C-alpha cells in the first residue's frame, strides 16, 4: 500500500531511486534484506545461504518504488525487499547541514562526518587540502585541494564480517548479492552534493574502474579517486591537477 512520508524522506527516496537508475543498480537502496542475511554489525553471524543470496541477486527492486508527488507518498509495487539507506543517509544529512550552516551565515567550515567531509568556503582565502585515505590503517593515498563541496569515501575497512578467516565487506554488489569485488580497495568521490558523493562512492566501488570511467564520461556529475587493490591510484580528469599522490 501507499505510505505518506515527510518531504525530506520523500526527496531522499526519490533522489536515491534516480541515482539507482543512473548507475544501473550499482547503487541500490533496496538491499536491506541482503545486508541482514550477511549480518553486518552483529556478533558472529552465520554464513548466508548461497541459494537465498542467488534468489536475491540482480533484482533491481528500486524499480518497484512508485512516487506520488502530489501527496508525497511512496508505494512498493512488489515485496521481497527492504530499504537500507546506509550508503546515502549520511550524504543527505550533510546536504541539510550545509544549507542550515549557510542560512546561519557560516562562510567557512569543514565538517568531518566519519568518512564524509563537507567543506564550505575557503580557509582564510586559501583552498583546503584534504587527506585521502584508503584502508583501516588510514594509509595516505594523497591530498586533494578543494574550494568547497563534498568528499565521500567508500571502502570495506571498518564494516565487515569474517568467515573461515576471510573478510566479507559490507559493500554489496546488487548483481551478485555478495560483497563487491571489482579490483577497487577504496573509492573517494568529490561533488557539489553530499548525497551524490555518498551514493556514487558506493556505486563506483561496485562498478569497478572501467564502468566508473564510462559513467564519468556520460554524466560528469562527480569527480573520483580510485585506489586499486594493488595500491595504485586512478584520478578523474576534473581533479587530476588538484590531487597530489603521496
Task: Briefly describe each language-model feature range.
Residues 1-246:
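Mature catalytic core of soluble alpha/beta enzymes
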